[in-house]
UniProtKB/Swiss-Prot annotation:
Protein name: CUGBP Elav-like family member 1
Gene Ontology annotations for the cellular component aspect, listed alphabetically: cytoplasm; nucleus; pole plasm; ribonucleoprotein complex
Cleaved signal peptide residues: none
Species of provenance: Danio rerio
Gene3D superfamilies: 3.30.70.330
A GO molecular-function descriptor: mRNA binding
Family: Belongs to the CELF/BRUNOL family.
Biased composition (Low complexity): 274-298, 312-323
Amino acid sequence: MNGSLDHPDQPDIDSIKMFVGQIPRTWSEDQLRELFEPYGAVYEINVLRDRSQNPPQSKGCCFVTYYTRKSALEAQNALHNMKILPGMHHPIQMKPADSEKNNAVEDRKLFVGMISKKCNENDIRLMFSPYGQIEECRILRGPDGLSRGCAFVTFTARQMAQSAIKSMHQSQTMEGCSSPIVVKFADTQKDKEQKRIAQQLQQQMQQLNAASMWGNLTGLNSLGPQYLALYLQLLQQSASSGNALNNLHPMSGLNAMQNLAALAAAASATQATPTGSSALTTSSSPLSVLTSSGTPSGQPAQSAWDAYKAGSSPTSSTSSSVNPMASLGALQSLAAGAGAGLNMSSLASMAALNGGLGSGGLSNGSGSTMEALTQAAYSGIQQYAAAALPSLYSQSLLSQQNVSAAGSQKEGPEGANLFIYHLPQEFGDQDLLQMFMPFGNVISAKVFIDKQTNLSKCFGFVSYDNPVSSQAAIQSMNGFQIGMKRLKVQLKRSKNDSKPY
């Protein structure tokens, strides 16, 4: 169907083929032409029909092509979500057809930064007009109407935009700007969504820093003072190695070690004391000193150390039997305060113990168990340091893990294999591997892909070389929010059991 005689045989090179939905199934091409022609000369209308019926019936949608791009955009602005046709319940849907996506606005739109605030739209158009026809030029302005020093420029073709980037990016430094001009493709909606998710993930990882090491100590409530002593031993050894965090108070590691010693002494005294009383009194307890926020930096540790040297006694009638392991959470104030930076290795060892003590095999205080406990602590240093303090942990250590695990489907021992639901659509094998590496040695990480669409099914498997790591991952990552959903992390079903764990 050709248009009127005052038009060429073909539409303009930048014309758009539009898809139109929510039209009556009884309408013919002539009726549709009457609908579209008020906005410009129509080159072609093609009603989509169901060929399985005889005669073929309209599907209630069509394609329309105007001679000019301007006419198509005017029709879209006037009709899309604006007009409801007779017999229909929803407004017309009008948008560029899928075949036009290769010339979508996002592929032709440039962001221009570091421009002089004295420039107006005409100046920017003049600057970019040598590279092709400009469809739109807009300077970003604040509430006061003043330029923010950046703009969006949309060309009619992607090649023009690419030429502008190649010639203009960092080609000059404009008046009042500290850096050369920036010319790049503007962020698409997908780019913005990915940035939002990444920012949200970073914030949640920061929250995880505190929770992953201190919030998970509740499972250790039944353990005795020998484990406190081991914490102290690990802290002493790591402090003597000189592997302390930079930019923190030099005495903070010693302070933490002294406080742990006081805690260990108090815990020992607690077990030696009858049930009715406790060495951890409200008046002289090292814990009460530890949690005091009004004391200047350095003094809490010294006070606790003095209490340890002098010995604690149940002098208060309101003695409480505070659980020594649960009370370890008081050390969080040391790690969070300005004067309290625990040695990195000691934090890692403590976090490793936190994961290692959760397994059923480490339930008594025998010598062999203590040796196994120490081994578990040191083997987990790198893994759990990344989980507890990712912002302070060297990324090079993470890269030492077997990156080839991404995409493989190798299974670990019983209880070391995880099933992860609600993964973001854009997550791949490598993303899954990076997310679960901090909790242990990952031997495989696989996101499942739909073979027909080649898109993620939003679930996957992760396998560790030991069950302790998988439990630590479940404890920290189950319920972890990414975007609008929360991850669901659980053990993979046993080969010998049809029911989940």
